[in-house]
Amino acid sequence: ADALLYRNDAEFARFLPHIPQPFTKRDAEAFVALNMAEPWDRTPTFAVTLNRKVIGTVNLDVDVDSATAMLGYAIGRTWWGQGIATEAARAAIAWGGETFQLARIWASTDTRNVKSQRVLEKLGMRQESLKVCKHVGREGELVYEVVYGLTRNAIAP
């Protein structure tokens, strides 16, 4: 139910075209079922909670063979600007680095999503490249993503 509340927000989903708008109860149920079905040793997803309420998620998409992982996070708009995304992502990075002995963690975000870029910079990630995204934006526009990365020395807690 909490996922329905924070994900049913056009501004929240602005740079996340895979999240339908409006976000219905059926969408929320599918989101939870999908994340529960993902193998924990490859795609761990954590609920971000505040006062026993789910306000977002943070996840890693681990490639064990290359000892790398993609970081993802999404926090409800009500809680933006409070350092919660940074704190949750930092915890996931430390946990993933130790659990999987990762050599590199990376993340990408829409070039227009300055707030997300700021989170990645606060995590110590450095901009590595710019790429054309494989999906289009909500308005059918071409999307460019900036890729940030963190190597083993910076992953250690």
How would you describe each model-predicted region?
Residues 1, 5-11, 47-157:
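Acyl-donor (CoA/ACP) binding surface of acyl/acetyltransferases
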Residues 12-34:
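Conserved GNAT-fold acetyl-CoA-binding loop/helix
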Residues 23-24, 39, 139, 155:
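A short hydrophobic/aromatic micro-motif that marks alpha-helical segments and, especially, helix-coil
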Residues 33-47, 56:
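A short helix-loop-beta-strand connector motif used in the catalytic cores of GNAT acetyltransferases and
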